[in-house]
């Protein structure tokens, strides 16, 4: 989990993958249509202009083969290919995350940054990504949207790109220890396991 924090005036959109799909099927898929709707949204562009923000769209590594199919109408929207980006840098340098079910939302929440879930598929991809153990309605770290227009509305509702009280509590419940000693704790846990195995 990312422990550093260095935020730019940038939105990050990162969505999970659709397994085993062809390009011809992908362009017909709800996933493509929903992402396209958001990327081409005049309301989103207006929001970015008003807030002087940039928007980085970073498809899942398995979806990067389709990155050429996406386009934007504004120089404030960047379609990011994996070859010229490091995921950790995108997480650190973004102040808001828009995602469907991608587990990067845990990293974002750990840094106490706002998350907006754009779950346009009525939970279908949730099953495919094995997130059945996580209840987004009950445990999620941000609002759930079904349409691109709803995402933009939620962006406007954010206050100074901070989590509201409801989601702060959920983050604290999920991550009761928040410091810079995670690596040390993992190391000590591994050492204890090794010691137990040698007994």
Residue spans for each PLM region:
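C-terminal amphipathic helix plus adjacent low-complexity
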Residues: 15-27, 53, 146-199
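Surface-exposed, flexible loop/turn segments at secondary-structure boundaries
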Residues: 2-4, 63, 85, 123, ...
């Amino acid at each position: 989990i990312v422990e550093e924090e260095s935020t730019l005036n940038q939105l990050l959109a990162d969505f999970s993958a659709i397994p085993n799909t062809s390009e011809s099927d992908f362009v017909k898929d709800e996933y493509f249509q929903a992402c396209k709707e958001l990327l081409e949204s005049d309301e989103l562009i207006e929001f970015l202009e008003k807030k002087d923000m940039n928007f980085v769209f970073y498809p899942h590594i398995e979806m990067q083969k389709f990155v050429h199919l996406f386009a934007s109408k504004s120089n404030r929207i960047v379609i990011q290919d994996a070859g010229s980006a490091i995921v950790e840098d995108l997480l650190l340098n973004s102040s808001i995350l828009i995602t469907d079910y991608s587990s990067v939302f845990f990293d974002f929440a750990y840094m106490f940054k706002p998350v907006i879930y754009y779950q346009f598929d009525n939970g279908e991809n949730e099953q495919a990504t094995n997130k059945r153990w996580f209840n987004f309605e009950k445990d999620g770290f941000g609002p759930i949207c079904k349409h691109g227009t709803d995402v933009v509305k939620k962006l406007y509702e954010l206050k100074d790109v901070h989590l509201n009280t409801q989601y702060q509590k959920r983050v604290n419940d999920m991550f009761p220890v928040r410091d810079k000693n995670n690596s040390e704790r993992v190391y000590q846990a591994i050492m204890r396991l090794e010691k137990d195995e040698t007994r």
